[in-house]
Each structure stands twice: as structure tokens, then as C-alpha cells.
Amino acid sequence: MAIASLERDDHGNPRFRGCTSIRDFEFLGKLGEGTFGEVYKARSKKDGSIVALKKILMHNEKDGFPITALREIKLLKMLSHRNILQLKEMAVERSKGDGRKKPSMYMVTPYMEHDLSGLLENPAVNFTEPQIKCYMLQLLEGLKYLHGNRILHRDMKAANLLISNNGVLQIADFGLARPYDEPPPEPGKGGGEAKRDYTTLVVTRWYRPPELLLQLRRYTTAIDMWGVGCVFGEMFKGKPILAGSSDLNQTQLIFNLVGTPTEENMPGWSSLPGCEGVKSFGYKPGSLREVFKDQNPMAISLLEELLKLDWRKRINAIDAINHPYFSSPPFPARPGELPSFEDSHEFDRRRFRGQRGAIPPAPAGGSVDQQQTTEIAVFPVLHALAGSLHTGFKTILQSALLKTGMLYHMDLQTRGSRFQASLVQKIAACLLNLLCLLIHHGAWVIQIGRHVREVNAIISEDGPMGNWIHTSRLTVTLVDILEKGKAIVRVPLLIGVIWNSNTLMKGINRVILGTDVLQEREAGVLTFERLEQRIEHCTDDDKLVLVSTDAERLRQMNPVTLLVLNDSKFITHLLLSMTY
């Protein structure tokens, strides 16, 4: 078989179309860093143009190229629009030394002086309404192009909107984007309906629409339009308008702003998997008009259309562009008429924050499958428990936790069957220790929430994954402690583990212990036979959590049931420590 000759660069390395050497660029400084990688400002030695270099982190070299980066590269190479960030080429940094280490890869894009979030945090920047209209029209034109080509962005937020000193806005960060199987939106028809399921583990929490928070799987382009509404409001207020501290709090903030869902304003909401936690909120009419009372009626009208609870009727990009807001005075500025500002990137924002003062914390939820590396942050349990426990129970529990350390909040993505086994054992040990500690000090019913469907959705989107832990998120929190030392402790646990190519680690979505079973236990007449009958009626998504000192009897029961042993010898190592 004949092998085509390869063009070689000045250093004798093979040059491929669309791929160059990192030596062709002069580094000018770092713009930002995070779990996604590192971003640098650089100058091309070939033509003198200023570019941004986004280094792709290879957290486990044996596993190959990160799938989120592959997805982003593939989509950006397909797209071509003034308001979509262009991927100019890929750059390779070959390893030094013996060459056994894999080369580093960089995405090369045009340099944009700002992102919208950075501009809004700059105390020297104040947007005029013509400027807001100009940016909004460009954002909507970019989304119209994406949705018209059946692409969902799935992480619409101010930080992902880049702005040049020429006033041009471009949509960036396509790590969560994916092709969309439904027809493109049509005028007057909102986002339409979806016919297939998608993962709900998308969109940064502060910009996440209510249907995703309620676990709608068949979502549409309307999820991006909700993010546009959040960005629109943010440009008026100068800060995020829905900065929730948790998914539940995020839902509360949304309903406080736009009103409580009903079957009239959000048909079908009460049948969504996540509705149970919000049914007790109580009716609220919404405060959007009051919050934005300083804006003109047309702006409020567009904001209401973008933040509509009913995703089927939420305005699409086509209709938003034609909204009367943009044809009423003051008219939109042209990009070239906008003022220029000092650069506003991640490192610049740190300085701005010192000038402006404290701003809301970074979204704790984030976009789960956007995480590209292991990140472990200490999360003190005692702080999380403050104000949530009955006084007597809190005193006992705090005393015990002070002796054992802290829990961890972890975002992790990794692969490998050996690591899986070790990880599962350590997580199980940590949870058992925690649960047993609680039981030992008064808790008597433990609920563990585990969403298998979301994990399956991630797997199915990218095909068979074999022995991979593709994207996992472990969050341990303690809430809803009841009075008199008898507690229902809810420990939300979301973790996707592919034990092998055929078996997904089973979990628990909700406890099926009814009040009758609780009453039987209270009366002292609850038997193992009664619990066994309950387990027989469980589905894969409804698994019972049992608490008992009789370990052998529990082991004889359903193997997918989580066994929680009330044994003091397990109350030793609450601190979960792992080295990657």
C-alpha cells in the first residue's frame, strides 16, 4: 500500500491539514484556567494575528482524547457564522525527552478581548440599552443559526459569550453541545416537541431552565432560550438574576420570579420526575415585572417570553429577533459603534471583583459532563448542617463529626476497571460510615437518591463505553432532620459507574417505605418478612434502604438493596480520602 508523503514543518515534524505546531505561536500570557484546561493569549508567527490557545487537558493519557473535546472540535469545524466562535486549527506541542509521553493539543481560535460575564463584573462598564439590544440581536442570530442546523448548545451563559473590541459577540464553549434529532424551530411555534430522551446533566445551574430542574428528558431548543433570558436580565442587573445555591433553591428562585407552575402555565409539570420536591412551595404569582420595573414595557415583554415556564410556548430565536423590543426606540447600536474596554477575562475578573466587592459564588452544580479532570474540594459538614438539625440531635452529631473530619464534595471523571472497583469500595465505605454514624445517634430511616436514568442518557449519547466511568458527580448533603431525635436523612447521591460493559451499578431513586411500614416499626411489629414483601415489588429505580444490626439476614435479601449496618466498628473513617 502506497503511503502519501507528508508535508513537514520547519522542525522536520509531519504537518497535517488543520493541525500546526505550537512552536508557530508566541505565548503572550494566560487568560484563564480551570477543569476544562488552560487558555492563553498568543501571536501567530506566520501572520502576526492574535489568537487564543485552549489547551486540552489529558487527565489520563491511556484513555485517549477527551470525548467532550472531540465533540466541541467536531461541531466547531462544521459551523460557520459571524456569531459563532471559529476554530481556526489545532496546534500540537510534542513532548520533550524520550517521546513516550503523548503530545499536548491546543484549540486555536480568534482572540476575543472579553467575555460577557467579565464585562458585567467590570465596575467601569455600564451597558446602555442600544448596546444591550446589539448584543442580544447577535446572540439570537447565533442561536437561530445553531438551532436551524439542529444543534443544541446546552450551556448558554454569560461566561460563554465572547465579545471583541469591535463589538462582535460570539457564542463559545461547545463542550456540552450536541446534534438535535428534531426539526428546526419554526416561526410562531416555540421550540416544538422532542421525540427522544436526552441527559438532564447539562446547563450551569444559574441558567438551567425549570423543566431540566424537574428532570424533563425530552427537552428542546427552548433550554437555550431560557439561558438567553437569564443573560438578558443579567445585562440589565449587572449580575446573575437567578443565583441558586442548590437545585432546590434554584427552583424556588425561578418560581419566585416567574410564578409557581400550574397545569395552565406549565402543562405536564406535575408528572415530571422532579416535581415532588417542589409541590409544597405554595402559590406565588411571580415578581418579574416588579424586579425589572425600571425597564421599558417591551423589554419586560421579551423577558417574559424568554422566561416562560411552558417550554413548548417559550419564544424561539426566530420570533425573538422579530420582537417589537428591537424595533422600538432606543434602537440597537451597530457593533462598530460600541465602545471598547480593557480586556475582561478570568484573571482580569479577579481584579474587578476586588474593586466591586463580593459577588455570588460560582455555580456549585455546573455542567456535570463538562468537567475534564478530578477536582476535590473540602466541604465542611458542620457548615452544611447549620440550622437544619433539631438542637439535641445536632449537638450529638456535631460532636461526633468533629472527631472524624469532614465530607468531600467531588467532581470527577475517570475511566478504568481497576479504578472503578477501588472507587466503588471507597465511596461505599464512606457512605456506610456516614449512615451508621447517623443511625448510631438517632436516625432511623435513611433515604438515598440516585438517578440511574441520567447516567444511562450520558452513556447512550456517545455510544458503548465499555469499562468507563464517563461522568460522575458525588454530592453528599444532609437535610430534613425531624424532631425528637428520630430523623429522616436524605442523602442525594448521583454517581454513574459502569461496572463492566453489561452491568450498571444499581442505585436507589426513592424510598418506598410507606407510612404503614413506618407505623409498624414504631409499634415494634415490623418483620423481615414484611420488608421482603416490599422488596419483591421494587423496580430497578425503587430500591429499599434497610437499617439493621442483623447483617446476615440482610445479606440474604435482594442483592441490589443497600445494606446499612448499625455497627459501631464501621463508625471509624468518615473522611473520604482518595489520591488520583
From Swiss-Prot:
<dbReference type="InterPro" id="IPR017441">
    <property type="entry name" value="Protein_kinase_ATP_BS"/>
</dbReference>
<dbReference type="GO" id="GO:0006368">
    <property type="term" value="P:transcription elongation by RNA polymerase II"/>
</dbReference>
<comment type="similarity">
    <text>Belongs to the protein kinase superfamily. CMGC Ser/Thr protein kinase family. CDC2/CDKX subfamily.</text>
</comment>
<keyword id="KW-0418">Kinase</keyword>
<dbReference type="GO" id="GO:0032968">
    <property type="term" value="P:positive regulation of transcription elongation by RNA polymerase II"/>
</dbReference>
<dbReference type="InterPro" id="IPR000719">
    <property type="entry name" value="Prot_kinase_dom"/>
</dbReference>
<keyword id="KW-0808">Transferase</keyword>
<protein>
    <recommendedName>
        <fullName>Serine/threonine-protein kinase bur1</fullName>
        <ecNumber>2.7.11.22</ecNumber>
        <ecNumber>2.7.11.23</ecNumber>
    </recommendedName>
</protein>
<dbReference type="GO" id="GO:0004693">
    <property type="term" value="F:cyclin-dependent protein serine/threonine kinase activity"/>
</dbReference>
<dbReference type="GO" id="GO:0106310">
    <property type="term" value="F:protein serine kinase activity"/>
</dbReference>
<dbReference type="Pfam" id="PF00069">
    <property type="entry name" value="Pkinase"/>
</dbReference>
<dbReference type="InterPro" id="IPR011009">
    <property type="entry name" value="Kinase-like_dom_sf"/>
</dbReference>
<dbReference type="GO" id="GO:0005524">
    <property type="term" value="F:ATP binding"/>
</dbReference>
<feature type="binding site">
    <location>
        <begin position="31"/>
        <end position="39"/>
    </location>
    <ligand>
        <name>ATP</name>
    </ligand>
</feature>
<dbReference type="GO" id="GO:0000785">
    <property type="term" value="C:chromatin"/>
</dbReference>
<dbReference type="GO" id="GO:0030643">
    <property type="term" value="P:intracellular phosphate ion homeostasis"/>
</dbReference>
<keyword id="KW-0723">Serine/threonine-protein kinase</keyword>
<dbReference type="InterPro" id="IPR050108">
    <property type="entry name" value="CDK"/>
</dbReference>
<keyword id="KW-0539">Nucleus</keyword>
<comment type="function">
    <text>Serine/threonine-protein kinase involved in transcription regulation. Phosphorylates the UBC2/RAD6 ubiquitin-conjugating enzyme (E2), leading to monoubiquitination of histone H2B and the silencing of telomeric-associated genes. Also required for histone H3 methylation. Necessary for the recovery from pheromone-induced growth arrest in the cell cycle G1 phase.</text>
</comment>
<keyword id="KW-0067">ATP-binding</keyword>
<keyword id="KW-0547">Nucleotide-binding</keyword>
<feature type="binding site">
    <location>
        <position position="54"/>
    </location>
    <ligand>
        <name>ATP</name>
    </ligand>
</feature>
<feature type="active site" description="Proton acceptor">
    <location>
        <position position="155"/>
    </location>
</feature>
<dbReference type="GO" id="GO:0070691">
    <property type="term" value="C:P-TEFb complex"/>
</dbReference>
<feature type="domain" description="Protein kinase">
    <location>
        <begin position="25"/>
        <end position="326"/>
    </location>
</feature>
<dbReference type="GO" id="GO:0070693">
    <property type="term" value="C:P-TEFb-cap methyltransferase complex"/>
</dbReference>
<dbReference type="GO" id="GO:0005634">
    <property type="term" value="C:nucleus"/>
</dbReference>
<dbReference type="InterPro" id="IPR008271">
    <property type="entry name" value="Ser/Thr_kinase_AS"/>
</dbReference>
<dbReference type="GO" id="GO:0008353">
    <property type="term" value="F:RNA polymerase II CTD heptapeptide repeat kinase activity"/>
</dbReference>
